[in-house]
Amino acid sequence: MTSDDTVRPGRPRSIETLAALSAEQTEAVLGLLDEAARTDGQQAVSEQGRLQLRGGEREGVSHLLLTAGGELVGYAQLEDTDLVEPPAAELVVHPGHRGHGHGRALGSALLAASGKRLRVWAHGGHSAARHLAQVLGLTLFRELRQMRRPLTDFDAPEPVLPEGVTVRTFVPGEDDAAWLAVNAAAFAHHPEQGSLTQRDLDDRKAEPWFDPAGFFLAFRGDELVGFHWTKVHAEEGLGEVYVLGVGPGAQGGGLGKSLTTIGLRHLAGQGLPTAMLYVDADNKAAVSVYERLGFTTHEVDLMYRTET
């Protein structure tokens, strides 16, 4: 959520809500996101949201295009796929068109579309986004930390795996179903991750950054019990602990820490200077583990919601 909500006179605006975007509309939205990221230093829409721009209609996802004078100046995405929580949204206004109330207009449209049950991300926690959340009557609900640590001095030894556990890399097509099942079980409490489908996995496998050599699977016999999927952000020189999960039956035995170390050793071996990861601030156990591994908080994403 990125917007300066100070209202100044501007060109007449309109908001169109669509179930899917055309190729031309997708490119226009991506251009808007890039312009905003250059100004804000961070993407206003998550990786999942950007993937959902392409590929036609997706269940529970809608796109709001705000135009002024025929020009696209704002975008919002609303996802209503969580069976428990309110719909989640992300929004952005072009840096050159802020201060005209476009953010408030998009926020009001999202509230109307969601039946006034809404969660909104503010990536980076910018002050303008916090102000807009207040104007819309939203309260802080969740804090997602991005943590980082240098890899230049990472010299952890090869980890000792729990008895009977072996690790190999992901084989696309062969391991998809098993990974989706363990991912769902490991993140049953975290619908954003645990609800990933084959289509979501295929989207990621089609991305230029996907590399199965950095996708580690832990097995006990023939049973997949955990994984560490790493991601390289080549332009930024960052290696990410992209997704780390351990099946419920294998938790508590040190497998998560071992998989973390395996992934970090891999990223360090790529010559990447820095590792990063995302973790919920209220997951005290995970934050403590990562802090012991040398990670510190780099920035935060904030989620706001309507009162329930």
Language model features: what each stretch is:
Residues 2, 136-155, 261, 268-308:
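Active-site/acyl-donor-binding loops of N-acyltransferases
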Residues 18-19, 23-26, 33-114, 119, ...:
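Conserved donor-binding loop and adjoining core beta-sheet/short helix segment
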Residues 1-10, 80-88, 94-165, 304:
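Acyl-donor-binding surface of acyltransferase catalytic domains
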Residues 62-65, 214-217, 261:
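Hydrophobic beta-strand residues of extracellular immunoglobulin-like
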Residues 74, 141-143, 226, 256, ...:
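A structural microfeature
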Residues 1-51, 159-194:
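Short amphipathic alpha-helix that is part of the acyltransferase structural core
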Residues 187-233, 248:
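Phosphate-binding active sites in nucleotide-utilizing proteins
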Residues 99-113, 243-248, 252-269, 287-292:
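Conserved acetyl-CoA-binding loop-helix of GNAT-fold acetyltransferases
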